[in-house]
Amino acid sequence: MSAAMRQRFDQFLHQKNCMTDLLAKTEAKTGVNRSFIALGVIGLLALYLVFGYGASLLCNLIGFGYPAYVSIKAIESPNKEDDTQWLTYWVVYGVFSIVEFFSDLFLSWFPFYYMLKCGFLLWCMAPSPANGADLLYKRIIRPFFLKHESQVDNVVNDLKDKAKETADTISKEARKAAVSLLGEEKKST
């Protein structure tokens, strides 16, 4: 690790939160530097993501659990900058999930897939202004969306209209069936 990266990693490990509190307690009880403890845990997680049973679940919990928690905290905070950061993450996460759905059948056979996926998601949620989500959104998703926005709006509006028509039709048919059923019950009594 370069000196600058090591310093940023060490600063991150000394921020005040529940994980660093746990690291501090572990460091105090064992006498082992929290950097080594964190790197050991990261190494074990990486090995588990390669060889462990349920690696998909663990990867999805990491990619969903922490971001969901900090998204709720962002919503409740008066600062709107963090809202934008996590909305950007969720847009990238959604696009990634759609792409992954179609490629998962092939990618899941790749031995390092879940470790790489987890690394990708951690890069997207990294606590820096130019994290992966921000980069992917600004360079790929936003330009694509702006180029095709009117077409996407048309498709969404058409789908919304068709869904409303279908819901209205189902509702009318359900009412007719209920009236018919009630009418038959009255005749039989």
Swiss-Prot record:
Cytoplasmic domain ranges by topology: 1-34, 75-84, 124-189
Which GO biological process categories is it annotated with? endoplasmic reticulum membrane organization
Q: Where in the cell is it found?
A: Endoplasmic reticulum membrane; Sarcoplasmic reticulum membrane
- Protein topology in the membrane: Multi-pass membrane protein
Q: Which sequence ranges are listed under topological domain Lumenal?
A: 52-53, 104-105
Print the keywords alphabetically: Endoplasmic reticulum, Membrane, Sarcoplasmic reticulum, Transmembrane, Transmembrane helix
- Which Gene Ontology terms of cellular component type are present? endoplasmic reticulum tubular network; sarcoplasmic reticulum membrane
The portions of this protein that span the membrane are 35-51, 54-74, 85-103, 106-123
One Pfam family assigned to this protein is: TB2_DP1_HVA22
Per the record, the domain of life is Eukaryota
Region: Required for dimerization and maintaining endoplasmic reticulum morphology; residue ranges are 114-185
Family recorded in the similarity comment? Belongs to the DP1 family.
**What job does this protein perform?**
Plays an essential role in heart function and development by regulating the organization and function of the sarcoplasmic reticulum in cardiomyocytes.
Describe its assembly: Monomer (heart, ventricle). Homodimer (atria, kidney, intestine); maybe disulfide-linked. Homotrimer (heart, ventricle, skeletal muscle, liver). Interacts with ATL1. Interacts with ATL2. Interacts with ATL3. Interacts with CKAP4. Interacts with RTN4. Interacts with ZFYVE27.
- Comment field on protein domains: The short lumenal loops between transmembrane domains 1 and 2 and between transmembrane domains 3 and 4 may impart a wedge-like configuration, thus deforming membranes.
Name this polypeptide is given: Receptor expression-enhancing protein 5
